């Protein structure tokens, strides 16, 4: 059994990318477990019991200055920077991790946990699912694909630093993370909530944007809270380190089952796959003024549609023409028993988005009777 619920004793966590979809969940979990938490972002984090550090991961000088007096024992790296090509992704994202670990050469680091994803098995965006793919569900021991991939470059940086600096490591391969974050580059949960809210506002159907394969195939996802638990487990459980692990919720579903249930939550007419994909980048084109008007009338916290939607990412995810799901046996056999029901991950996120005024609340909640 995993024991990451045990209180921290003199442990200090450095969460890199602390305002993102995975990092924010880690910050919350670690603070709840009694860790001293250092949250490293460019914008800062305001949370009780958490000390924010502002630094630029692209600048060794900025990192050296920001971390000069810090002594983290555990590092959780969840940051990445999207570039135009995979060559640039490799150059930039490998450097982000390398710069951070170099800046910690003086620190008593015991473990570094790195978040990546299932593009480890699928390939990067520009060569996505090209060539022969491993069979599903994906297993951690699959060999690397013969293509350039910034996940591979980050692993190589991690392993070299572990050998040089003497810490243990873990890699966490997540699939489509569901969680709370604003301005995140890959945020399907918030994106679908915004799509459904706009459809509700305009009395339009809630149209599935993806492929026939995704509509009918089995798939899975990763709750950000579960990802945080998994990274903490691997960082602290005896004999769990120095391994790469898949991390998904533990259930599987088909979008043809899930989509009507998401539509029912928002009270919109859910429409499934019909003939061809209908991408969100097309469906939601020109909706910036609609969203700004909704934000003004409903008192929403973010009027900028680009800050609460990532149409391109959701289109790419739901437009895949292959089945995508991951095996969790390795984590289970090592002692991690965490689980989430994906429908609950969605609805709990939607509840929080409403409470935080990121999407409109139902009229009844606002004190206005619903029309009959």
Predicted regions located by residue number:
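Conserved glycine-rich Rossmann-like NAD(P)H-binding loop of the short-chain dehydrogenase/reductase
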Residues: 35-46
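NAD(P)H-binding glycine-rich loop region in Rossmannoid oxidoreductase-like domains
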Residues: 45-49, 53-102
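Active-site Tyr-X1-5-Lys
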Residues: 142-175, 180
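Glycine/proline-rich active-site loop of Rossmann-fold NAD(P)-dependent oxidoreductases
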Residues: 165, 179-195, 225, 234-245
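N-terminal Rossmann NAD(P)H-binding glycine-rich loop of SDR-like oxidoreductase domains
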Residues: 6-33
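A conserved pocket-lining segment of Rossmann-fold NAD(P)-dependent short-chain dehydrogenase/reductase
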Residues: 194-225
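Mid/C-terminal beta-alpha module of Rossmann-like enzyme folds, strongest
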Residues: 228-315, 319, 327-329, 333, ...
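Conserved Rossmann-fold NAD(P)-dependent oxidoreductase catalytic core, especially the SDR/UDP-sugar
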Residues: 75-77, 88, 95-150
């Amino acid at each position: 059994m995993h024991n990451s619920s045990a209180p921290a004793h003199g442990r200090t966590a450095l969460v890199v990318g602390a305002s993102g979809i995975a990092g924010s969940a880690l910050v919350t979990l670690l603070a709840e477990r009694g860790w001293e938490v250092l949250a490293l972002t460019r914008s800062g984090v305001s949370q009780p019991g958490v000390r924010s550090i502002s630094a630029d991961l692209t600048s060794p000088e900025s990192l050296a200055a920001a971390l000069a007096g810090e002594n983290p024992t555990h590092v959780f790296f969840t940051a990445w920077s999207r570039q135009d090509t995979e060559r640039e992704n490799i150059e930039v994202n490998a450097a982000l991790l390398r710069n951070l670990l170099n800046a910690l050469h003086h620190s008593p680091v015991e473990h570094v946990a790195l978040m990546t994803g299932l593009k480890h098995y699928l390939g990067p965006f520009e060569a996505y699912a090209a060539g022969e793919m491993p069979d599903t569900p994906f297993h951690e021991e699959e060999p690397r694909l013969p293509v350039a991939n910034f996940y591979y470059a980050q692993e190589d940086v991690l392993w070299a630093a572990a050998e040089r600096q003497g810490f243990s490591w873990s890699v966490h391969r997540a699939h489509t993370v569901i969680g709370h974050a604003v301005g995140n580059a890959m945020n399907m949960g918030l994106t679908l909530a915004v799509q459904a809210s706009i459809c509700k506002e305009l009395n339009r159907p809630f149209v599935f944007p993806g492929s026939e394969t995704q509509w009918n195939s089995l798939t899975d996802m990763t709750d950000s809270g579960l990802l945080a638990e998994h990274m903490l487990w691997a960082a602290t459980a005896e004999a769990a380190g120095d391994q790469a692990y898949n991390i998904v919720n533990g259930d599987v579903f088909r979008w043809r089952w899930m989509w009507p249930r998401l539509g029912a939550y928002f009270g919109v007419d859910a429409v499934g796959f019909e003939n061809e994909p209908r991408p969100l980048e097309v469906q939601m084109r020109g909706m910036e003024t609609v969203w700004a008007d909704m934000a003004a009338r409903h008192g929403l916290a973010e009027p900028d549609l680009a800050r609460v939607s990532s149409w391109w990412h959701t289109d790419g995810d739901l437009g895949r023409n292959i089945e995508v799901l991951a095996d969790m046996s390795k984590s289970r056999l090592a002692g991690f028993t965490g689980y989430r029901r994906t429908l609950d991950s969605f609805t709990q996120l939607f509840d929080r988005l409403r409470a935080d005024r990121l999407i409109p609340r139902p009229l009844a909640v606002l004190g206005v009777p619903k029309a009959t």
